[in-house]
């Protein structure tokens, strides 16, 4: 594994570079997933994210730790989760052949042990897709996907502990764009999201169902499903 830790996507990409690695199956991804789940010496940090036991101490020292009830509200987990899910969204956008952007304020944050978020984004500057004040307003959104015309396809705000209302205010200012708007957070914050969406200031967002809530668990699952789709020559 790269640096002792890797997503299933990274494992999938790198394992075929090994000359001695031969697969007698048409579904190698499923085999890889089964192997990492059941091989001694490999442990799961999150769904779709695995590490070597021999690197556990080093990884934990770098803030890459298994979340539990005791540490879930710690700063180290907050920092790790925010950068990790930004990284997943950047990878998923690229798999869907979209351009991806992460703000400059986050570009030097580490995604696992190998990459910076700035290295994962496909464009280094946000496109001038509209009036300067609107482009500037969107430039701090955690992850943006752009279509082939350099127009916003999806806005994502990752909310581990910060106030969801701040993200909704951004979305409110950008509601005239035909782009998906998504709050990514722990499922336990879903009720808070619904409560904030009912504020009068966001009545238009609520009425038009402009903002979706995506739980970490759902994102993890969709990331894995997106990887599985990559093995097919044609996807319906």
Per-segment meaning from a language model:
Residues 208-236:
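C-terminal helix of von Willebrand factor
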Residues 7, 100-103, 183-184:
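A structural signal for short, well-ordered beta-strand segments and their strand-loop junctions
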Residues 9, 18-68:
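Charged low-complexity interaction tracts in eukaryotic proteins
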Residues 121, 127-141, 147-215:
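Catalytic cores of nucleic-acid endonucleases
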Residues 32, 63-105:
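Nuclease catalytic cores
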Residues 28, 85-86, 139, 167:
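Amphipathic coiled-coil/heptad-repeat helices and related helical stalk/stem segments
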Residues 73-78, 94, 102-150, 223-233:
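Active-site metal-binding core of divalent-cation-utilizing nuclease and nuclease-like domains
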Residues 1-9, 13-14, 18:
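Positively charged, polyanion-binding regions of nucleic-acid-associated proteins
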């Amino acid at each position: 594994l790269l640096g002792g830790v890797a997503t299933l996507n990274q494992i999938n990409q790198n394992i075929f570079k090994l000359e001695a690695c031969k697969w007698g199956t048409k579904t190698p991804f499923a085999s890889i997933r089964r192997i990492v789940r059941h091989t001694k010496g490999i442990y799961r940090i999150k769904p779709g994210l695995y590490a070597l036991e021999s690197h556990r101490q080093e990884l934990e020292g770098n803030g890459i730790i298994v979340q539990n009830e005791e540490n879930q509200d710690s700063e180290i987990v907050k920092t790790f989760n925010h950068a990790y899910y930004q990284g997943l969204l950047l990878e998923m956008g690229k798999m869907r052949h979209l351009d991806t952007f992460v703000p400059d304020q986050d570009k030097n944050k580490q995604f696992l042990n190998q990459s910076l978020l700035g290295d994962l984004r496909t464009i280094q500057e946000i496109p001038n897709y509209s009036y300067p004040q609107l482009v500037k307003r969107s430039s701090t959104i955690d992850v943006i996907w752009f279509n082939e015309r350099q127009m916003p396809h999806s806005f994502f705000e990752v909310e581990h502990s910060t106030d969801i209302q701040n993200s909704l205010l951004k979305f409110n200012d950008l509601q005239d764009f035909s782009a998906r708007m998504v709050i990514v957070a722990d499922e336990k914050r879903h009720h808070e999201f619904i409560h904030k969406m009912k504020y009068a200031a966001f009545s238009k967002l609520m009425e038009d169902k402009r903002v979706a809530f995506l739980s970490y668990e759902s994102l993890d699952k969709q990331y894995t499903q997106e990887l599985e789709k990559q093995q097919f020559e044609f996807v319906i």
